[in-house]
């Protein structure tokens, strides 16, 4: 049986070879093909042999038909292979688009939570101002009432002295005359006076309002996020489209600049940290490049190889916002913040802004924009070339965010870190000047 199978499957050989001979009638050539048995046979087999009555055809014609089937199979396999390759490409592209979309959604959330914190801070200030105003008005009423009582005491003391003098009069006639003159007033003074009981001023309505507000938020946040999103009709509508995973996260307008201006600062630059080939304006707000270095001793904090400069004052707590004008800075600029421990000597990564753990920055060079920290970089794709950057620092929250002010406060990048030292505004120049505008 194995021999027959081998013979049946063996390719056709030239005349005289074993593969051309009928396995049943070995003296005859196997010039036909039995379709039912799948074997090459001779002309006698379908008439007198074991393949009698079976459908047969010429072996050469069957070989042509099989070759066409093989070609069709190969073409089908190639098509399916291309389809699977296309599927892989589509999946990889969808994965990359999902990563970009996830990053933009997280940036959007960072922006929204920053706005929320700013709004809550503003609400806290308003609530405290309400308490202060109510307290001052009530204290003013208390003071006026106390002054009235004091004046009445003075009147009573004066009247007591007069009555006591009448009682000491030795002449009965004069005593009675004096008594008659003061009898009416004495009767008035002898009537019981009213007692003043200040009504306590209650701030419970304010406290209860914000207590219920916090409890409502807390109760909402106790529900798992996926449940909250399913229950939200807006999220359900957003989720109706299945073309993009994570479609629940929507891009919204940029935050209002006024929210940040409440924390506005105008940091001046420190000439002692400035590279020798940089020049600082008299107000300390504009720095530009110079062909010549400065003469005289080199201060220890000065950058000796990189055209960098730090702010004069650092921020070790709270929220701060400043802006940087880079419209004339040319093809390259670096804007960020740094610890005072940033290395000042040499041009190694330990001294370059954004290339170490001591500094963070947004960089532009030759139409490309990047965010740098500790040697790690993220590509930025602003909608337009930023001419003025807004820098927002929330020290306790560990947020350092950059915005395109002229582009409607569109978000550029946010760094998250547990800050360990004061942060100083930091700049690095390539060719043109960089300025820090005065903010209201």
Curated annotation (Swiss-Prot):
PROSITE patterns: B302_SPRY (PS50188), ZF_BBOX (PS50119). Ubiquitinated. Undergoes 'Lys-63'-linked polyubiquitination; this modification allows IKBKG/NEMO recruitment to MAVS. Undergoes 'Lys-48'-linked polyubiquitination by RNF125; this modification mediates its degradation via the ubiquitin-proteasome pathway. Expressed with high level in spleen, thymus, liver and testis. Expressed with low level in the brain, kidney, and skeletal muscle. Expressed in various differentiation stages of B-lymphocytes. Changing residue 51 to N: Loss of inhibition of SPI1-mediated transcriptional activation. Residues 247-440 form the B30.2/SPRY domain. It comes from the Eukaryota. GO terms for biological process: inflammatory response; innate immune response; negative regulation of viral transcription. Disruption phenotype: Knockout mice have an impaired herpes simplex virus type 1 (HSV-1)-triggered antiviral responses and become highly susceptible to lethal HSV-1 infection. n addition, TRIM14-deficient mice are more resistant to inflammation compared to WT. It is found in: Mitochondrion outer membrane; Cytoplasmic vesicle, Phagosome. PANTHER family: B-BOX DOMAIN CONTAINING, TRIPARTITE MOTIF CONTAINING 14. The B-box zinc finger is responsible for inhibition of SPI1-mediated transcriptional activation. Interacts with MAVS. Interacts with WRNIP1 and PPP6C; these interactions positively regulate the RIG-I signaling pathway. Interacts with CGAS; this interaction stabilizes CGAS and promotes type I interferon production. Interacts with USP14; this interaction mediates the cleavage of 'Lys-48'-linked ubiquitination of CGAS. Interacts with TBK1. Interacts with SPI1. Interacts with KDM4D and USP14. This is Tripartite motif-containing protein 14. The gene is Trim14.
């Amino acid at each position: 049986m194995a021999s027959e199978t081998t013979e049946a499957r063996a390719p056709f050989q030239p005349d005289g070879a074993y593969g051309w001979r009928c396995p049943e009638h070995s003296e005859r050539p196997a010039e036909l093909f039995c379709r039912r048995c799948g074997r090459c046979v001779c002309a006698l087999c379908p008439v007198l042999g074991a393949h009698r009555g079976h459908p047969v055809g010429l072996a050469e014609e069957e070989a042509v038909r099989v070759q066409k089937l093989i070609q069709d199979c190969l073409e089908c396999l190639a098509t399916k292979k291309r389809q699977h390759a296309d599927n892989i490409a589509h999946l990889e592209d969808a994965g990359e688009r999902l990563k970009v979309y996830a990053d933009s959604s997280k940036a959007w959330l960072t922006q929204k939570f920053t706005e929320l914190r700013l709004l809550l801070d503003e609400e806290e200030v308003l609530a405290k101002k309400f308490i202060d105003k109510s307290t001052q008005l009530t204290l003013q009423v208390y003071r006026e009432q106390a002054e009235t009582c004091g004046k009445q005491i003075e009147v009573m003391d004066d009247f007591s002295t007069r009555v006591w003098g009448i009682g000491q009069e030795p002449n009965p006639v004069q005593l009675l005359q004096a008594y008659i003159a003061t009898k009416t007033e004495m009767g008035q003074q002898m009537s019981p006076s009213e007692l003043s009981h200040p009504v306590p001023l209650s701030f419970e309505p304010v406290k209860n309002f914000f207590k219920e507000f916090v409890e409502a938020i807390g109760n909402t946040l106790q529900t798992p996020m996926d449940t909250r999103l399913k229950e939200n009709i807006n999220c359900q509508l957003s989720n109706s489209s299945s073309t993009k995973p994570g479609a629940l996260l929507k891009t919204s307008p940029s935050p209002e600049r006024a929210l940040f201006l409440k924390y506005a600062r105008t940091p001046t630059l420190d000439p002692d940290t400035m590279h020798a080939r940089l020049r600082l304006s008299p107000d300390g707000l504009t720095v530009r490049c110079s062909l010549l270095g400065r003469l005289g001793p080199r201060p220890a904090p000065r950058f000796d190889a990189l055209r960098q400069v730090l702010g004069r004052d650092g921020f070790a707590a709270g929220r701060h916002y400043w802006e940087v004008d880079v419209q004339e800075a040319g093809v390259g600029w670096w804007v960020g913040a740094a610890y005072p421990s940033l290395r000042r000597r040499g041009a190694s990564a330990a001294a370059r802004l954004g290339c170490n753990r001591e500094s963070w920055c947004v960089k532009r060079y030759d139409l490309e924009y990047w965010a740098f920290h500790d040697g790690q970089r993220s590509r930025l794709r602003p909608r337009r070339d930023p001419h003025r950057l807004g820098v927002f620092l929330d020290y306790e929250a560990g947020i350092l965010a950059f915005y395109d002010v002229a582009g409607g406060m569109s978000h550029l990048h946010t760094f998250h870190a547990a800050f360990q030292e004061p942060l100083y505004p930091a700049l690095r120049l390539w060719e043109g000047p960089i300025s820090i505008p005065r903010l209201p």
